[in-house]
Amino acid sequence: MRKTILFLLISVFVGHSSFADKTAPEITKLKRPLPKSILFVGNSYLYYNDSLHNHFKRMVDEKYPGYEGSKNVKSSTIGGSRLKHHNLDHLLKPEAISSIKKFELVILQGGSGEGLSKKDREAFANTANEHATKIETNGSQAAFYMIHAYVEPHENFDPNLIRVIEKMYVAAGNNSQSLVIPVGLAFEYAYERRPDIKLHNLDGTHPALLGSYLAACTVFASVFNVSPVGLDYDYNGLVSTRDKLFLQEIAESTVRSFYRSS
């Protein structure tokens, strides 16, 4: 009952988002499921709090014992970077990272400031399409990690920024026929349900541990098309049982609502 109510509430939030303007994801699951090697590409939003890819790997280890992807999940990050700052040509080369011949899935995370102006959004759109094309040409799959928005006291806080982020990431996914992972929406819905929860650091931009945990749950649910609810992983007890279940349910309901909106 609790999960059903949460899903219905999030569905209402989705109805008031940019989806009212028919901006909905066209791709709702990976064309080739269960990727055995995954590369995260982004900035400090990924590497804070022991790195999102490590939390994600531990969830994969728990859900799929012996799954090869658990040792083939890597991350390439540059602090403060935007999409254009990453050398995809190099990252896609065989054994550019470890002994991995080819990453079956490449998850792209853009910079926090790429939605602040029309010029920035256009540059993001162009780079997103270029990167996705390179990834697909390599025989890999591309996915876009929709970032969270700023919160106060960040100087660029704007309550409507998440709508801009949502629209630009959905457009990037639709233009390249790539999966979009709705991390930013999960943050929004978590705050709607529990305004007191701390998903951001004090700077209003970087994720706190609970933010990274929520993001990992959202990526897990999106990539594997499976619910994270019930996972035992709690980062060695640093995520409380209450927070763990809440964030797992938020991730599950966000992903279900986002993909069902199309």
At which residue positions do the language-model features occur?
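Conserved SGNH/GDSL esterase-like catalytic core that processes O-acyl groups on lipids
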Residues: 37-38, 46-125, 129
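Bacterial Sec-dependent signal peptides at the C-terminal "C-region" and cleavage site
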Residues: 14-24
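A structural signal for well-ordered alpha-helical segments within the folded catalytic domains
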Residues: 50, 54, 209-221
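Conserved catalytic region of serine esterases and O-acyltransferases that act on ester linkages
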Residues: 206, 216-262
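Short N-terminal segments immediately surrounding and downstream of signal-peptide cleavage
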Residues: 22-42
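Sec-dependent N-terminal signal peptides
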Residues: 4-13
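Alpha-helical cap/lid subdomain in secreted, periplasmic
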Residues: 95-209, 221, 230
